[in-house]
């Protein structure tokens, strides 16, 4: 994450000071504290410094940033703390006028850098008032603003604080998605799909109901959007989601599941192959997935399902599938040594499993030989 943290660095802060063109001593001093901080912490640090240096009045803060928008250089990740400052100033003011204007300013800022993070505290403060304004963004001519309407109200937006009222009322954002699922911009539609996929974590029936409605009133992109939105439910084998996408229960046999090695040393990979046979009397549309059962820190196994392929098999037909799966340490996954397993999944149904070992790369150690001197 080191390179990511540098998205808000000394150069960016100095450029911000130059653009705002006013004495900002606390902001300048904050540069010395950036190094050990994460990107989120850097955004908070700069925002807190801006709140010290700028006037207390919300109107003065908003005017300073609207003036800065005239400069094309007022862009990039430094906009994150700007948005947080706007939110803090509006909540400090406490008036409905400041609240509404803060959301309007977020819409102006979002083409420079997404405002999806700073609007979360406004949603926390008054979700109904905020959603009323956000709903109006769905008809904006700016695709960045339309995307913000969906992305900023996601229930499990990565990096963002949770909005309890949205978690308690999952249906509250559906009108926003209904207005955007046929948007002309792929950028917006991807956000809609991810938003619906978020909801699928806890409310799969609601998600399938919404997706079914969209499929009954589609445009040329709706089928692809729905497939992306239901991806997690397909991996979980949720029957209504599978059937909506045309993956009905099928009579199939999975055989000859073969691994190219019984032991993977990190970093490394595992190659495998298997065959699927349609034993039924009709053609079968199949979602072919596989699950790796990873060893957790406590020694238990936890499955992670991966997409492999879609296929249509005629009655009696057989098809062979091959895949190579990489194993390497990542910030999002820590590997542990031990007995893992690989399993094939077809239309949400699991077919056996094959064990294999994962071995961590040995750390080099050196033993001093006194004969070699000190």
Region locations from a protein language model:
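Surface-facing alpha-helical segments and adjacent helix-coil boundary elements at the starts of domains
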Residues: 1-241, 265-273, 282-285
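Short beta-strand and strand-turn-strand segments in soluble, beta-rich domains
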Residues: 252-255, 296-310
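Short beta-strand segments of immunoglobulin-like
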Residues: 258-265
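Short solvent-exposed strand-capping/beta-turn motif centered on an Asx-Ser/Thr pair
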Residues: 277-283, 349
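Short acidic, flexible loop segments centered on an aromatic residue
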Residues: 285-296
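A beta-strand/beta-hairpin structural motif
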Residues: 303-330, 358
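Short glycine/proline/serine/threonine-rich loop/turn segments at secondary-structure transition edges
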Residues: 329-339
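Short beta-strand elements
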Residues: 349-366
């Amino acid at each position: 994450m080191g390179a990511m943290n540098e998205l808000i660095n000394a150069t960016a802060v100095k450029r911000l000071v130059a653009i705002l063109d006013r004495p900002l001593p606390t902001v300048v001093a904050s540069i010395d504290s950036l190094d050990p901080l994460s990107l989120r912490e850097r955004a908070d640090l700069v925002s807190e410094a801006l709140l010290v240096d700028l006037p207390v009045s919300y109107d003065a803060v908003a005017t300073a940033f609207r003036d800065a928008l005239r400069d094309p250089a007022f862009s990039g990740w430094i906009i994150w703390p700007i948005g947080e400052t706007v939110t803090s100033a509006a909540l400090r003011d406490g008036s409905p006028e400041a609240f509404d204007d803060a959301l309007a300013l977020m819409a102006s800022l979002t083409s420079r850098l997404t405002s999806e993070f700073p609007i979360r505290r406004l949603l926390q403060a008054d979700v109904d008032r905020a959603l009323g304004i956000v709903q109006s963004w769905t008809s904006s001519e700016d695709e960045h603003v339309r995307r913000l309407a969906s992305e900023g109200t996601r229930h499990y937006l990565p990096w963002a604080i949770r909005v309890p009222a949205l978690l308690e009322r999952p249906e509250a954002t559906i009108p926003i998605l209904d207005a955007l699922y046929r948007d002309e911009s792929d950028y917006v539609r991807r956000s809609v799909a991810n938003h619906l996929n978020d909801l699928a974590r806890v409310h799969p029936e609601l998600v399938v109901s919404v997706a079914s409605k969209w499929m009954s009133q589609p445009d040329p992109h709706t089928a692809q959007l729905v497939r992306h939105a239901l991806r997690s439910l397909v991996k979980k084998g949720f029957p209504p989601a599978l059937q909506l996408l045309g993956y009905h229960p099928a009579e199939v046999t999975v055989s000859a599941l073969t691994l190219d090695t019984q032991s993977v040393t990190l970093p490394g990979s595992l190659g495998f192959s298997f065959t699927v046979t349609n034993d039924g009397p009709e053609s079968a549309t199949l979602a072919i997935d596989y699950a790796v059962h990873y060893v957790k820190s406590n020694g238990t196994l936890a499955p992670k399902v991966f997409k492999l392929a879609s296929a249509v098999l005629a009655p009696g037909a057989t098809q062979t599938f091959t895949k190579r799966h990489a194993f390497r340490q990542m910030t999002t996954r820590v590997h542990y040594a031990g007995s893992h397993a690989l399993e094939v999944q077809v239309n949400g149904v699991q077919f056996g499993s094959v064990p294999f070992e994962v071995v961590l790369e040995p750390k080099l150690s050196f033993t001093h030989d006194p004969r070699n001197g000190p």
